[in-house]
Amino acid sequence: MLMRLLRMAERDGGRCAGLVLLIGAVFGVGLVRLLQEGLQLSPQQSLRVLVLAMLHLVGPLVVALIAFTRLTPLWLRRGRQGGPHGGWLTLGPAFLVGPLLLIHALMGALVGGVLASAQGGLELGLLHGVGAIVPMDLLSALLRTALYLAAAALLCFWEGQRRLPRQAGAEDLIASLIAREIALMVGLKLIWTLAVHPMTLPTLP
């Protein structure tokens, strides 16, 4: 079962990874340019702010939104057709693929940010960027992303079990599910920020 879940998570990741990398890189380029040209921050400071933004807000949200649009029909179908293991086949891959996609988004943002900055080279810039990652912030972001996707997959599984097969693939149902997944994600983010891991802003050197 575990190997099956891993293979499914790998396939699900392949549906989203390219877009996640692209959006991460675009965000990294845009934010670093804004910070350096608009706020006159140094390259090191800009990368620290980029990492902070990716881990506390942008990364998990972008990954979740892309996954919702790409994987919701798949989660719904698995919940409806998975048989006695439908719950595992729906929630398991969703929980596993979230952290992997967040790593893709973070690496894309760092590469984009380094290329947009005035760092001496890509390797040196990446070292500065990776060095700015706080382990507990990274762990929190990984867990939060996994939670977002698992909660959305659970919603799809519930709908797949509740709806008739001919209704479960309807476009209006998919759109409704995505909207509810977004609302669920916002609620989970609010609870996480207030009760589990409040955001703290570090002092820039």
Across the structure, where does each feature detected by a protein language model lie?
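Short cytoplasmic-facing helical segments at TM-TM junctions of multi-pass membrane proteins
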Residues: 74-91, 167-170
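Membrane-interfacial helix-loop-helix connectors in multipass membrane proteins
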Residues: 34-55, 107-146, 150, 155-176, ...
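Hydrophobic core segments of alpha-helical transmembrane domains in multi-pass membrane transport
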Residues: 27-29, 148-157, 185-194
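Selective transmembrane-helix segments that form parts of the transport pathway or gating/packing helices
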Residues: 13, 17, 21, 86-110, ...
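Hydrophobic alpha-helical transmembrane segments
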Residues: 1-54, 85-96, 119-137, 191-205
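Long, hydrophobic alpha-helical segments
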Residues: 52-72
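Final/C-terminal transmembrane alpha-helix of multipass membrane proteins
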Residues: 170, 176-196
